[in-house]
Amino acid sequence: MIDLWPAIDLINSTSVRLTEGKYDSKEKMEKSVEDSIRFYSQFKCVKRIHIVDLIGAKAKEVKEFDYIRSLRKLTTKPIEVGGGIRSKQTIENYIHSGIDYCIVGTKGIQDIEWLTHMTHQFPNKLYLSVDAFGEKIKINGWKEDAKLNLFDYVAKIEHLPLGGVIYTDISKDGKLSGPNFDLTGRLALYTSLPVIASGGIRHQEDLFRLESLNVHAAIVGKAAHLDEFWEGLS
């Protein structure tokens, strides 16, 4: 099966989910962050845990560093972190605290020279998060239009030693309506970088379909909080 990366989105050290990235749609999850990590860690199909500092993404600087660092001891699974990462120092701080991978978004999209430098400083440790409505890339916590096309932009960074590209269709995020198979599949064919699908994943059938499209991994948010999603998985 495709690699499975369950997501934990943080606001004030609490696990929440948003719909279409809108902060006023915040929904608190029943399981605590700690319980979620312990639960996900029991599954072999879970290859890493994806954590996002939502306030950090909005504030353009990391807000949950100490709390996220405290989570490292709860699992032996690799952890990747995103949200507000815009400096070499922040990346170093996370890596030195035991976080395995960092996700960069807005800064990397707006400043390819910086992204190039960082990927060579931390080869295969950085993932680029590209969030879009269709092919139109959004930045700064999905609030602003980057005025960039998804495919045009990925062509410019394809040669970099990134771990991969995380593509989120914002219109699907948090809705449990299925991912954007068309665009995600086209992107996986278009680039030699590993493509990670995010947004809208509902059930295991979605995972199998993404796998058939040569997608490397799937980030699962709201569905991962539903017991039925995990039925039959080990």
Curated annotation (Swiss-Prot):
Catalytic activity, reaction form: 1-(5-phospho-beta-D-ribosyl)-5-[(5-phospho-beta-D-ribosylamino)methylideneamino]imidazole-4-carboxamide = 5-[(5-phospho-1-deoxy-D-ribulos-1-ylimino)methylamino]-1-(5-phospho-beta-D-ribosyl)imidazole-4-carboxamide
InterPro entries, alphabetized: Aldolase_TIM, His_biosynth, HisA_bact_arch, Isoase_HisA-like, Isoase_HisA-like_bact, RibuloseP-bd_barrel
Leader peptide range in chain numbering: none
An individual GO BP term: L-tryptophan biosynthetic process
Major subcellular site: cytoplasm
Listed GO CC annotations: cytoplasm
Family statement drawn from the similarity comment of this UniProt entry: Belongs to the HisA/HisF family.
Descriptive protein name: 1-(5-phosphoribosyl)-5-[(5-phosphoribosylamino)methylideneamino] imidazole-4-carboxamide isomerase
